[in-house]
Amino acid sequence: MKKVYELDFRGRKLIVETGELAKQATGAVLVRYGDTVVLSTVVVSKNANVLSDFFPLMVLYQEKLYSVGKIPGGFIKREGRPTEAATLAARMIDRPMRPMFPDNFRNEVQIVNTILSVDPDNSPEMTAMFASSLATSISKIPFDGPIAGVKVGRVDGNLIINPTVEQSENSDIDLTVAGSIDAINMVEAGAKEVSEGDMLDALMFGFDAIKELNKFQKEIIDDIGEEKMEYEALEISDDLKVEVEEKCKSDIDSALRIKDKLEKYNKLDEIKENIVLEYEEKYNDLDDEEKKEEITKVKLVLEEIEYEIFRSIVVKEKLRADGREMTEIRPLSADVDLLPRTHGSALFTRGETQSLSVTTLGALGEHQILDGLDLETEKRFMLHYNFPQFSVGETGRYGAPGRREIGHGALGERALAQVIPSEEEFPYTIRVVSEILESNGSSSQASICAGCMSLMAAGVPIKSPVAGIAMGLITYGDEYTILTDIQGMEDHLGDMDFKVAGTRDGICALQMDIKIKGITKEILAEALANAKEARMKVLDVMLNTIKEPRKEVSKYAPKTLTFMVDPEKIKDIIGKGGDTITKIIQDASGVISVNDINAVKVDLEDDGKVIIYHTDKEVIEKTAKMIKDVVRVPEEGVIYKGKVVKVIDSGCFVELWPGCDGLVHISELDVKRVEKVTDIANVGDEMIVKCLGYDKRGRLNLSRKAAIK
C-alpha cells in the first residue's frame, strides 16, 4: 500500500513515498526534494558467505540523463560507465552507511540509487544518501541507522544548509557532513583557507540539520519498518579464542613492536601461518567444508588478537607502530626538478610513503569537459592519482583507475584547487599526476604535498603552498588516543582516517571516514588542532625545498600571448569549416597537421580574446601577426603587396594576408588592354595592388593598374 510522508526541511519540501514502486526489492523508497527525485532500492542476498573476511556492500549511483532533459552523446545514445561524479557520489553514500551494519554480517547487500529528476538547487547526492538509509532501515536488513547527510555552505559569514547553485558559487565552504542521530561519521569538504574553529562550527551546524532528517526517518521506520532478519554468521567459541591466544599472544605482541613495516608484516604473517598450519593438521579428519570453516574461525581469532593487542599498546602504553610519539610526524624529505623534460616535477617522501608528482601545462582549449547531470561545464585544473601495486610490494591488476584512485585524486584536486590562479591570471589548463611509488598510509596527503611543489616548480603562481596530513583515532574501552600522520597499520586497525589539507592560513580540504558509529565534537576539535600543528611542520620542509613558485614556466612548457580582437571577427579567424585558422596553424608552425605535437595552439573566445600557445616565441609572434592580418580591414586608396591565389577568366584573386583576398578584374590588371589573365598573373605570383574599396555585396576590389600608374 502506498504511503506518503512529508517534512518541511529548511524551507523546501522533502517527500517520501513507499509501497508503490520496485515492490520486489527488499526495500525501496522514492524521495522528492524540491524537483529532485531519487528512487533508492536495496536488495539482500538469501545466503551469506560466512567464510568471507569482508562485508559485500555495493552502492550504485545511476545518473540518468533524462533526469536533466539530455540525450546521451556518442553513437550508442545510452548511458555508459559511471562518470567520476557518480563514482564519488556512490562512495559518499557507502562511507557513512558501512559502519552501521553488524560486524559479522556477510550477506551481499546492493543499494541502487536511480536519479530520476534533478533540480540543480537540490542535491541529488544528499537526496540519494537519505533515500539509501531509509530504504535499508525500513527493510529486514540489519542496519543500525538511520543516517543522513547535508551540504553546508557559508556566504558572507552566514552558514547555510543545502545551499543553492548561486549560494554555492559565492560560498567559501563546500562541506558535506553525514551521521546518525547521535554522532558525525563522514566528512568531505573543500574550503578557501577556513580556520579550524570556523570549520568545526560548520560541522556542528550541519550535524544539527542531520538530526532533523534522522528524526524524520525514525518516524517512518516506526510506522512501516520490517522486523530485522536472522542472519547466518560464524560462531567462535570462547575456548578457541583462549587456546589460540595462549599459543601466539606474546609473539604477536613482540611482532607489533617491530618498527620496520616489511619486517613487522613478514613476522606477523609467519606467526599466523604457523598457527594456521598447526590447526590444519588438527582438523585433517574433517571434510573439506568443515575444515575450511574451522580454519576461517582460527584466522578471525588471530585478526582479533592482533587488533586488541595493537589498540592496547597504543592507548595504554602510548606506543605507536613505528615507535613515534602520538603527535610525531614520520621523517620528511622533498625534492623538485627530477624530470628534465616535464613542465614541473617534485618528489615528496614521508616515512615509507612516497609520491612523484608531475605538472603539465596546456592550452585552455585542452580543458576537461564534464557532461553529466550538471550543465556542461569545463574543468581547467585536474589532479590524477595512480596507485600501482609495486608501491606496496605486491602484484595485481593494472588498468583503468578504480573507485579508490578516483576518490584520492578528487581529494587532492579539491585541496589544491583552492589556490590555483584564475584563468585571467594564468591562462593555462593544468594537469597534475601523482604517481605513488611507495605506500605505508596517507598517500593522498603525500600527493597534495608533492602536487603543490610540482605546481610551484612549473611556475604556476599558486596563492599559497598547501600541505596535507592524515589523523587517526584508536579507541580502547572508554579511552581513546588521536594519532598524527597515521601509517598503514594504524589506518587498518584504527577507527578513523581524518585527512586535513591546508595552507598556513587555513583549511582547504577535509575527508573523514570512520569504522565506529560516530565521533564527538571534542575528538574533531582535537584532531583539527593537532593537524594544524603538523601541517606547519610539513610546510616548513616543502618551503625549504622550493620557497615560491618559479617566475617563469619551463622552457618545455608553452608560452602564451593574449590579445583582443573585435568579437565579430572571430568567425573570420576561424574561416569556413575552420580553413583559415587551420592554415594559420600549419603555416606558422611549419606542420602538416594541426594535431602535430609541434603545432601552435590557438584559443578563440566569444568575447574576442585570442590566446596563443607555443614553446617558441617566434612562432607565437608569427601566429599573432597572421591572426591580426585576418582581422585587419584594407583601407581604400592604400597600396599593398599580395599573392595571386586563384586565376579565373575575368581576373584573379590576390591574397593580401591570410583570410583577406580581393578580385583584380581583368580590366584592372594593366594600363594596357589585357587579352588573357595569365599573360599578367599566375597562381603564386606576387603582385602590387591598390585597394579600390568594396562593392555593394561587400566584396573587396583591387587594382594592379592603379598601383603601377
Q: What does each of the following model-derived ranges do?
A:
Residues 27-29, 122-140, 336-359, 440-460, ...:
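Conserved phosphate/anionic-ligand binding catalytic regions in large, soluble enzymes, centered on
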Residues 558, 567-709:
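Single-stranded RNA-binding regions, centering on S1/OB-family and related RNA-binding modules
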Residues 231-238, 537-563, 617, 621-641:
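Long, charged amphipathic helices and adjacent flexible linkers at domain junctions
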Residues 25-109, 115-117, 122, 188, ...:
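Glycine-rich, flexible beta-strand/loop modules in the N-terminal catalytic cores of phosphate-handling
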Residues 1-232:
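Long, basic N-terminal domains or extensions that often function
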Residues 140-259, 455-551:
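Mobile "lid/hinge" segments at catalytic clefts and subdomain interfaces of large enzymes
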Residues 113, 185-190, 231-235, 246-256, ...:
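Short, hydrophobic beta-strand segments
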Residues 1-45, 49, 232-375, 558-572, ...:
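Extended amphipathic alpha-helical scaffolds
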